[in-house]
Amino acid sequence: MTKVVPIRDHHVDLLALYEAGLELYHSGGLPKGETTGWPGVDEFYTVGRGQWTVVTGIPGSGKSEWLDALMVNLAEADPAWLFCLYSPENFPTVGHLVKLVEKRVRKPFNRGPTDRMSTSEYASGAAWVLEHFLWLETDLKSPEALLDAALSYRGDPNRKLGVVLDPWNTLEHQRGGMNETDYVSLVLTGVTHLARETGAHVWLVVHPAKILRNRDGTRPVPTPYDLSGSAHWYNKADNIITVHRDQVEGQDVEIHVQKVRFKNLGRVGLAMLKYDRVVGRYFEMKHYVEGELYADPERR
């Protein structure tokens, strides 16, 4: 005979919930996330723990480069950050290390017209990078295996864990008998649960489907509904960011924040950054656009 369990055994402790809300009230309200290092981007997106973010953009837009710069900014602001990276397109791995060192040292690694980092600067920069970044083995191919491996590093309560899978499209997806839409929905639900349970922040880099050029030859900004696989990307993700730039005209970079689930962490809108190609860093441009740009989430 099935045991009847009183409903009161399953609800949240209401007194504890009330007291937690009161504590937040007296502290000023729900907190923002951690700064990206760019005040203009912080207007629209801050990094909350226990969440996940989609980063997308057309090929060559710099989405991986921007994400690297974001992680360096986070670790410089708070040394507790540890990032687990799966980034097979950043090959060889030593090249990815060098790019992160350049961002840390603010000098180029290679010989050239710009003042190059010294061997001691490389040594200190590399030591810093290796304190905050580790690379997952590329023989782990499925999103489930990679997330499990990354989350095995969450044991130290004094560290903040960030996980990057870049890009999603290169992973091996074992769908079994499921269609792609159902598979994407299932895996992304798992990403949400893992982030919530562990307090990690997960970034998934996702290539959009092929996007046709405008009549003037420019390429439109990809939207969440252009992502390869499923509209579940928009429904499931906590945050969606598109990195976009004109690859011919210059180094102005558009950071399109197209979804933010929790209003204390940000809002939709557009911030502009300037890209320094020599060391791979991004700098503020005092030009921000309010969120009406994305008033209709169904726009294409």
Regions found by a protein language model. Give the residues of each.
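C-terminal regions of RecA-like/P-loop NTPase motor modules
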Residues: 1-20, 112, 124-126, 143-160, ...
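Cytosolic-facing regulatory segments adjacent to core modules
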Residues: 38-43, 77-159, 173, 270-271
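Structural recognition of the conserved hydrophobic beta-strand(s) that form the central parallel beta-sheet
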Residues: 85, 164-165, 200-207
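The Walker A/P-loop phosphate-binding site
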Residues: 2-107, 298
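Helical hairpin unit composed of two closely spaced alpha helices linked by a short loop
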Residues: 161-194
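Structural motif
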Residues: 54, 135, 162-166, 203
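Flexible beta-alpha connector loops of hexameric P-loop NTPases
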Residues: 111-114, 135-137, 172-185, 215-225
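Flexible loop/turn segments at secondary-structure boundaries
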Residues: 61-63, 91-96, 143, 170-174, ...
